[in-house]
Amino acid sequence: MEIKYDISIIVPVYNRENLIKPCINSINAQTLDKSRWEVIFVDDASTDRSIEVIEELIDKNINYKIIKREVPSGNASAPRNEGIKASLGKYVFFLDSDDYIDSKLLENGINIALKNDSDIVYFKMELNARTVTKRPFKHPIVDKADIEKNHLMRTLRIFKMFKTKMLRENNILFDVTVNVCEDMLFGATALLYAKNISILADRDYYFASLHDEPHLSKKKMTLEKLFHIYFYTIQSLYCSNRDINFKIKFYNALLIRCVEHLRDICKKDKINNENLIRIFSFASDLFNLHKEMFELKQIYENERL
């Protein structure tokens, strides 16, 4: 497909007439020349005035289009996939319709991406006035990040810039059968194929909000779904053509992420000791499928079991 812009912002929308204004205002405020980017709103069969509100608020000097789905998908995966397929940008950036971004995100993001030929650009993120994760964002700017040293596996949310060519050549799309943590699976898969990764943490760039309104991505995580994601990612890693050193780094970073993820879920759900043993035994069996990639020195002391 023709590349016409530097960046395509992809915004899935579902019944957001009362919440989308900050999102659109932040899009209107972007400092990057408007001729260099586009916005793709993908409406998932909203039943309110979301589309009308977009048309009312969006700066008409911005290149934008609205894709209207006839049947609701129930999650953000299908709308995001439609956005990827319709993109005319060298990079795509995912923005949820109830979140908003810093005015410099596109400008600073494309500058570091073009400078380093980045496949992914990470942005420091804030959730309800608190930074979501800190380790990947210790340094203000990282041109060439390392999956281990820069803790890239610790933030798999998809609010990043991804090179469109990388996504299309490797058929990286959101799995529409996964209705929870679909961004985690997408992020891990993209990380598997990315050769150059950059980080921007000189300011908060992405602002996520939590509220009680219906949300395309808001589903309860279950252990079964979580293990499905990790199993798929491990198998994809094993079958990839990446060199063994990268595979070892990726595998052990994923292992750490899995242990932390399970620990947080078990703590939140107050899992009893008997079930704790069963859950972590299952996780051990899962990663033992390719235990030849295990590297103890890559595991932090407090994460070792």
Protein language model annotation of sequence segments:
Residues 1-232, 239-241, 245, 260, ...:
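Nucleotide-sugar donor-binding/catalytic module of glycosyltransferases
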Residues 209-305:
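C-terminal subregions of glycosyltransferases and related glycan-biosynthesis enzymes
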